Amino acid sequence: LEKLIMVLQKELTCLGGAVAVPYKEKLFAILSNNCNETIRKIGAINCIFRSNPNDQFFSCTNTDGEGALEPLANILGGTKPLNIGLIGYGGAGKAIAGFLQQYKDKHEILLFNRTLPNKKFSDELEINFIDLKELPSKIGEIDILINATSVGSQNNLNEKLIRREYLHKLKNSSLVYDIIYDPTETMLLRDSKEIGLDVINGMEMNLLQAVLAYKHTNNTTLSLEELKKIMGSSD
């Protein structure tokens, strides 16, 4: 893999590209010196690109986290302090946690997972890691609940992340966000909607991470909105 990257870097007609599982962490290890501090804390990349067309080396980023938070930009950028509950610390969860860091002085960020990360990750991200078993006792405090696990996806359709009785503990004003896009309505979102909560699915994140990757790779001056329209959606 490292030899391949060295060859591609020398070929200036190769602008970059997308990085998929299982190479996100492996490529990060090779290109970590060319990432910003946020990406180093995440420890995984999904996009390589040249910051300048004549650069001899690839830069790298992770558009999963940036794409996931874009639909929440107006809420997160508001003046009201919020409690944000993020469930899952896999590839997408790490990316979202890394980009949520920019809001840690304004909002309380709680990361729920079945297993707790080592102290190094916890200290670097400066986020409160909590055992998933404690979610039922904490859920009533949460303003934005984000599912970054695969529970509820096509491969796990019959699995339930949170029992409906626990969703009833959420505030009436709470927002439930599931980054899964297939199906477009997971059991978590269906239950939340029936309770009367606002919900967001993963369709926009899926588009935005690709739009952002295209923008990086092609070094374009087109705006995010212009690229969204070109790539199939302005919603």
Question: Model segments located where?
Answer:
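NAD(P)-binding Rossmann-fold cofactor-contacting core
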Residues: 105-125
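Glycine-rich adenosine-cofactor-binding loop
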Residues: 62-65, 72, 76, 80-101, ...
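Rossmann-like adenosine-cofactor binding region
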Residues: 125-199
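Phosphate/diphosphate ligand-binding glycine-rich loop within oxidoreductases
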Residues: 1-76, 191
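Adenosine-phosphate binding glycine-rich loop
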Residues: 174, 179-235
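Conserved S-adenosyl-L-methionine
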Residues: 102-108, 195-198
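Short glycine-rich anion-binding loops that position phosphate/pyrophosphate groups of nucleotides
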Residues: 20-26, 92, 150-153, 182
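Short, conserved loop/helix-junction motifs that constitute active-site signature segments
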Residues: 77-80, 101-104, 164-173
